[in-house]
Swiss-Prot record:
EC number from the UniProt entry: 3.6.1.-
Protein's name according to its UniProt entry: Uncharacterized Nudix hydrolase NudL
Record family assignment: Belongs to the Nudix hydrolase family. PCD1 subfamily.
Entry keyword annotation includes Electron transport: no
Organism whose genome encodes this protein: Shigella boydii serotype 4 (strain Sb227)
Pfam families with a match to the protein in the record: NUDIX
Cofactor: Mn(2+); Mg(2+)
Length: 192
């Protein structure tokens, strides 16, 4: 697939035709969810945030809006939508959820479910000052280009863990966020 010519229709048809395989064990039982906001344009965008430097965990990192599932959430999808509204003012009613990717285990002990949603191009994003320092859009075709990600193997507590690294403009995209983007690319048939 030529990543430079990815249209929203291409993305949607590939995502819907190539369903994710969910078949692995997890050690993490605490649930979390992130919204993967795809901006509806002829050449779609991927909305990302940069977390506030004042946060205890993942300070300053590029991330998708999201967080822990709480008791008021009916599902992981509801949690992702609630967190997106809290962090960047995306109303849940503005998100067309098209599916989920297989959950990812975080190093902080959560099983994180990526929720894919299409959002309108004209939403007035408003970053929560407590949680988000920046909101930016990356062209989806660029984000899904696997050649932009570089592996780094980390050894922690006797285990090997691979993380992926990339830059977009002044933003360093790595860790779980980069891994989720790569999984989305593989899910729609982008070849490594």
């Amino acid at each position: 697939m030529e990543y430079r010519s990815l249209t929203l229709d291409d993305f949607l048809s590939r995502f819907q035709l190539l369903r994710p395989q969910i078949n692995r064990e997890t050690l993490n039982h605490r649930q979390a969810a992130v919204l993967i906001p795809i901006v509806r344009r002829p050449q779609p965008g991927l909305l990302l945030t940069q977390r506030s430097i004042h946060l205890r965990k993942h300070a300053g990192q590029v991330a998708f809006p999201g967080g822990a599932v709480d008791d008021t959430d009916a599902s992981v999808i509801a949690a992702a939508l609630r967190e997106a509204e809290e962090e960047v003012a995306i109303p849940p009613s503005a998100v067309e959820v098209i599916g989920v990717l297989p959950p990812v285990d975080s190093v902080t002990g959560y099983q994180v479910t990526p929720v894919i949603g299409i959002i309108p191009p004209d939403l007035p994003y408003r970053a929560s000052e407590d949680e988000v320092s920046a909101v930016f859009e990356m062209p989806l075709a660029q984000a899904l280009h696997l050649g932009r990600y570089h592996p780094l193997d980390i050894y922690r507590r006797g285990d090997s863990h691979r993380v992926w690294l990339s830059w977009y403009e002044q933003y360093f995209v790595w860790g779980m966020t980069a891994g989720i983007i790569r999984e989305l690319a593989l899910q729609i048939g982008v070849k490594p």
